Curated annotation (Swiss-Prot):
Compartment annotation: Cell inner membrane
NCBIfam families: glycerol-3-phosphate 1-O-acyltransferase PlsY
Alphabetic keyword roster: Cell inner membrane, Cell membrane, Lipid biosynthesis, Lipid metabolism, Membrane, Phospholipid biosynthesis, Phospholipid metabolism, Transferase, Transmembrane, Transmembrane helix
Keyword Metal-binding: no
Pathways involved: Lipid metabolism; phospholipid metabolism
Species classification: Bacteria, Pseudomonadati, Pseudomonadota, Gammaproteobacteria, Pasteurellales
Protein family (similarity comment): Belongs to the PlsY family.
Protein name stated in the entry: Glycerol-3-phosphate acyltransferase
GO cellular component: plasma membrane
Principal subcellular localization: membrane
Domain of life: Bacteria
GO biological process: phospholipid biosynthetic process
Catalytic activity: an acyl phosphate + sn-glycerol 3-phosphate = a 1-acyl-sn-glycero-3-phosphate + phosphate
Amino acid sequence: MSLFAIIYMLFTYLLGSISSDVVICRFTERNDARVTNSNVLQKGEYRLVLVVFLCDVLKGMLPVWVGYYLGLTYFELGMVALAACLGHIFPIFFKFSGGKGVATAFGAIAPIAWGVAGSMLGTWLLIFLFSGYVALSTVVTALILPFYVWWFKPEFTFPVALVCCLLVYRHHENIQRLWRGQEDKIWSKFKK
């Protein structure tokens, strides 16, 4: 791995550490310091959800695309994707307490191949529509995703598998609630 790639990965980690929800909260003068997508959905502020989601996706997507045009190897690009997700999940600017990394991971993995992005999104939507559980959709998609990557772009399988392990780890509390039958379906949040 080149020195440039390592420096670029550190830069990407720092970029990933910028919390979109906190920045948007400050720009919109909201009191809630953590405008996460699920929190905003519960409050009915759908435009903010879209803005936070797009910013989180771009945190993962832009560094990978730029790295591709800078001539990074496939392995280095995979590590850049991992760095973006690590920054979002364990941000240095917020005492290493961040989000779950789903949108950032999607953004980081999507540039690999449109087939991977479509398969990932299709799997997530299918499971979500049948179950109503966001966490279940995310975890199952994260478990299947390395196989999609292996099928379309096998050279990215290892770094993407690491990102998927992070996603499953960040959802461990949701997995426990699902197991106990205590996880809320997304529809129940709208009924409140």
